Amino acid sequence: MRLSQEVFALAMEEKAGICYQVVVNGFTAVRCFLTGTDESNIVWLERKKNTVLKSRRSSLRCGLEAEAAGSLEPWQEDEELYVIRGGGYPIWRQDGTFVGALCISGLHHEEDHRMAAEAVRRYAERRKETGHEGSGIDRG
């Protein structure tokens, strides 16, 4: 099962009105809008993606780190490009190579983050069960 299928299955399981995108090597591989979302969510997806690609960390973690440091720099330099709220999640290969981002929008930002983390966890678990843990996208 692909990562995008894990996100879709999780959204169906939780009856979550989300949109999501999977970005690999800078290119959007999948973008899906479920009931309850619309084109306005694209802005959130893009800002979360930009944050993850710049930092190689989750957008929620970037926000928590900025809050702890007492500074929103460098995220304030262009608020139209970045957002330090949950829902942008990094994708890493098992060998430690950064691959891209899974971004979710449509729920409270902490729920967006939780869903992304859970989808990546399920995907990694499934790859391990099928003997593919040494290649592909395995952890986030």
Regions found by a protein language model. Give the residues of each.
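N-terminal targeting and processing segments of secreted/endomembrane and organelle-targeted proteins
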Residues: 139-140
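Flexible, solvent-exposed loop/hinge segments and secondary-structure transition points
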Residues: 1-92, 97-101, 107-128, 132-134
